[in-house]
């Protein structure tokens, strides 16, 4: 029950403490038609608050007017009753329409085959190198110096014919006249059967 006091009030008046607004409202109990009021019937009278009252700051603004129910109307209660409740999220979604559906998945392109044509594995034929052909020495006994030096057999000897001495010996061998050796009698009578030394005179 709210705290009440009659201290300093006229007969029939009572002061009742309002916990919300931290102040007294006054009621004339001698008049059944009287309404509760916030103003003290005695001007300049200040009634101290109850001993166990909370001294926190009261709500801002003056207290509302009292009705016949002898209970002060609170502005917060009136405001909460008048304010409509917020619409649920489902109602808001229906009001604005359903959310757009995502785009259907795009058809993928067929994967292209990755291949390369087979390259011919061949190399152009390399020309075969001819093997050097060494000519056989000529049967003629007399040759010119240029013929001997140009002979691949001679040039192939390399180190055997290197040096001036070897060349000099070769020159003398080729410049030497040919010699014919006769065998005594030789059972041919020195070719007498062919006209009496016809062939022999050519050699002497």
UniProtKB/Swiss-Prot annotation:
InterPro entries documented for this protein: WW_dom (IPR001202), WW_dom_sf (IPR036020)
Composition bias, Low complexity: 66-100, 108-117
Localization in the cell: Cytoplasm; Nucleus
The keyword Nucleus appears for this protein: yes
Chief place where the protein resides: cytoplasm
UniProt keywords, alphabetically: Cytoplasm, Nucleus
Domain of life: Eukaryota
Chain ranges of the WW domain: 7-43
GO cellular component terms attached to this protein's record: cytosol; nucleus
Designated name of the protein: WW domain-containing protein C11B10.08
Species this protein is from: Schizosaccharomyces pombe (strain 972 / ATCC 24843) (Fission yeast)
């Amino acid at each position: 029950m709210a705290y009440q006091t009659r201290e300093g009030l006229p007969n029939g008046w009572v002061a009742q403490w309002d916990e919300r607004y931290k102040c007294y409202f006054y009621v004339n109990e001698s008049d059944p038609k009287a309404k509760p009021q916030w103003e003290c019937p005695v001007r300049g009278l200040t009634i101290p608050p109850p001993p166990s009252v909370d001294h926190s700051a009261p709500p801002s603004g003056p207290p509302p007017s009292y009705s016949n129910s002898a209970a002060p109307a609170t502005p917060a209660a009136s405001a909460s009753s008048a304010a409509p409740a917020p619409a649920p999220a489902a109602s808001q979604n229906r009001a604005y329409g359903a959310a757009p559906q995502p785009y259907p998945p795009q058809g993928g392109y067929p994967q292209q085959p990755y291949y390369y044509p087979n390259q011919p594995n061949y190399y152009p034929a390399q020309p075969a190198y001819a093997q050097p052909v060494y000519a056989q020495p000529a049967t003629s006994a007399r040759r010119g110096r240029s013929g001997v030096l140009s002979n691949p057999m001679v040039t192939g000897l390399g180190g055997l014919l290197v040096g001036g001495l070897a060349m000099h010996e070769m020159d003398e061998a080729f410049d030497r006249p040919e010699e014919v050796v006769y065998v005594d009698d030789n059972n041919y009578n020195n070719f007498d059967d062919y006209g009496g030394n016809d062939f022999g005179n050519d050699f002497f």
